[in-house]
Amino acid sequence: MGQKVNPIGLRLGINRNWESRWFPTKQSLPENIGEDYKIRAFLKKKLYYAGISQILIERTAKKLRVTVVAARPGIIIGKKGQDVENLKNEVSKLIGKEVNVNIKEERKAQASAQLAAENVAMQLEKRVAFRRAMKKVIQGAQKSGAKGIKISVAGRLGGAEMARTEWYLEGRVPLHTLRAKIDYGVAEAHTTYGNIGIKVWIFKGEVLQKGVQPEKTEEEAPKKTRRARRGK
């Protein structure tokens, strides 16, 4: 199960929070979902080079607040914050409601799965060898403190006639462990040979309750050594 489903959706309410935070009525649910989709699609396309890792949308009775978490917030803010005001007006015009836009910096950009996937995609579009691109991203994630990272690329790799899937794994990525904090990101690289899909899983550690000690696995538990018997 953990190998197939989206690891973020599997852990919602356990160690991950929702990116859309609001309580709808039966009548407002379709409208709110449609507005959230429009906002995210617009911001991801317009601010692609700012390195967006998350877009959080919060609603109250009369207000709508959008928080953009980006690796390069200076590109979004602009001189004296003028670009943020223009962005706010464009989003408000898009959905026909007043919107408050906040910008936050992604402090550990190399440990963000979404940014890692987009980084690999950008390198593939620049004709960098896919193995080199994957290894570079893995090294960056490990330097940022990631406990494990897995990258999968699928498509006509290196211009091959037949599509295939290749993946690299460094450290450990326990997808079945619900207390494991795992970040997940996907991206597409548009190359002359066709589209290449990229998936990234980053394991950032385990979230434990206070006073609960993790059980030792067979690998961590001390192993008993057996003495070899001598023949008579």
Curated annotation (Swiss-Prot):
UniProt region (Disordered), positions on chain: 211-232
SUPFAM superfamilies from the UniProt entry: Prokaryotic type KH domain (KH-domain type II), Ribosomal protein S3 C-terminal domain
Domain of life (superkingdom): Bacteria
Domain KH type-2, first and last residues per copy: 39-107
Record-level GO BP terms: translation
UniProt GO MF annotations: mRNA binding; rRNA binding; structural constituent of ribosome
A cellular component term, taken from the record's GO annotations: cytosolic small ribosomal subunit
InterPro entries: KH_dom (IPR004087), KH_dom-like_a/b (IPR015946), KH_dom_type_2 (IPR004044), KH_sf_prok-type (IPR009019), Ribosomal_S3_C_sf (IPR036419), Ribosomal_uS3_bac-typ (IPR005704), Ribosomal_uS3_C (IPR001351), Ribosomal_uS3_CS (IPR018280)
Pfam family membership, one: Ribosomal_S3_C
Basic and acidic residues bias locations: 213-223
Keywords for the protein's UniProt record, in alphabetical order: Ribonucleoprotein, Ribosomal protein, RNA-binding, rRNA-binding
Transmembrane segments: none
Sequence similarity: Belongs to the universal ribosomal protein uS3 family.
Job description of the protein: Binds the lower part of the 30S subunit head. Binds mRNA in the 70S ribosome, positioning it for translation.
Assembly notes: Part of the 30S ribosomal subunit. Forms a tight complex with proteins S10 and S14.
Protein known as: Small ribosomal subunit protein uS3
